Amino acid sequence: MGLIKQLFTNCACPQGRMGRAMLKFMNLCHAPLTNWGLKLVNIQDGWTMLDIGCGGGATLQRLLKRSKDAQVYGIDISEESVAKAKKVNEEVLDKQVFDTQGSAEKQPYEDGKFDLVTAVETVYFWPNLPNCLQEVRRVLKSGGKFAIMVEVVDGDSMWTNVVEGMTAYSPEELKTMLDDAGFTQTEIHRMKPSNATIIGIKG
């Protein structure tokens, strides 16, 4: 397996040396998309927020900076990711930032806990996406928001041919799945042809 292939195979569940390199790459390269997407959400002070597929923990930092007195939770299936996210946020770990290893499909949180759930460049790898969306809806408060941020659209074989286990969805497909999961006021926002944020609200 070539070096590039090895690196991008670590997108779904970073492991080992290549996984750590991928987490650094994600923290840096996801910044423009994440910062733009979070501006669309109108985050309020004191919110309780969750980032699913938290990777290297940079989105947890960005959420915390946008909400005074917030509590920010991260969950990721990768042990390497959780370790990196904890290190990046160690000054506020277990005070304002709480990170755990786990799956998008079976989250260890009570019903109606979060004001906002985010998913940055991660839904491509979620197993049984409709079930995962129902789980997101379960942990959101009534009126809570779910923001999906993606840089890849359906049919982008440049990535899906390189990254094992990746499924690219169009923004329209994701919006339809949010509608089917019971989210309301779903909207698609575009920054570039291949950059989108899809937002839904738990009614």
Describe each PLM feature range.
Residues G182-T184, R190-G203:
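Core SAM-dependent methyltransferase catalytic element
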Residues L116-L129:
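A short SAM/SAH-binding and catalytic strip from SAM-dependent methyltransferases
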Residues L28-W47, R62:
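Conserved alpha-helix/loop element of class I SAM-dependent methyltransferases that forms part
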Residues L50-K106:
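Class I SAM-dependent methyltransferase SAM/SAH-binding core
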